[in-house]
Regions:
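N-terminal alpha/beta PP-like core and its mobile active-site loop of ThDP/TPP-dependent enzymes
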Residues: 1-159
Length: 159
């Protein structure tokens, strides 16, 4: 089992039935295999806004989940994240991330560094052994306290 398979299983166990997304992110295929319906968008912000609307309509019982590619895909998401943060809307955001060996090469976009001011919580999965605990903390953050976007960046060589 690889990292994206494990994350998809956790999402399903947490009751996720739909996931908005923008290609290309390996989690999209793995989530579909577990029965999570991917809803594809033509722009990252649209996917985030749909996840935001899903969370708003479900009264805190379910959360919008969105997956997108790393780099430009993650960069295009900041507007939607800022809106969800400003309105205290809990959404789970799962961007891809650069492979560990290239994470600190400039000008790579690192979600965990760039989104700190517009999200409730942000973590990066560096090793497969972190997946269970990082995802547990992500869902705890979604369920507790003020709402807001929770980000789990999935490095390409781990997930």
């Amino acid at each position: 089992m690889n990292g994206t398979e494990f994350i998809a299983q956790i999402l399903k166990q947490e009751g996720v039935n739909e996931m908005t997304c923008f290609p290309s992110n390996a989690l999209i295929e793995e989530a579909a295999k577990t029965g999570i319906r991917p809803v594809m968008f033509r722009h990252e912000r649209g996917a985030i806004m749909a996840a935001d609307g899903y969370s708003r309509m479900s009264d805190g019982k379910r959360f919008g989940v969105v997956a997108m590619q790393h780099a430009g895909g993650a960069e295009n998401s900041v507007g939607g994240l800022s809106q969800a943060f400003g309105d205290n809307v809990p959404i789970l955001v799962l961007p891809g991330g650069y492979p560990l060996e290239r994470r600190n090469v400039r000008p790579n976009f690192l979600a965990n560094e760039n989104w700190k001011g517009v999200v409730k919580s942000v973590e990066v999965i560096h090793t497969p052994t972190q997946i269970k605990d990082v995802m547990r903390r992500a869902f705890q953050a979604l369920r507790n306290g003020n709402g807001g976007p929770v980000v789990v960046e999935m490095t390409l060589d781990v997930c």
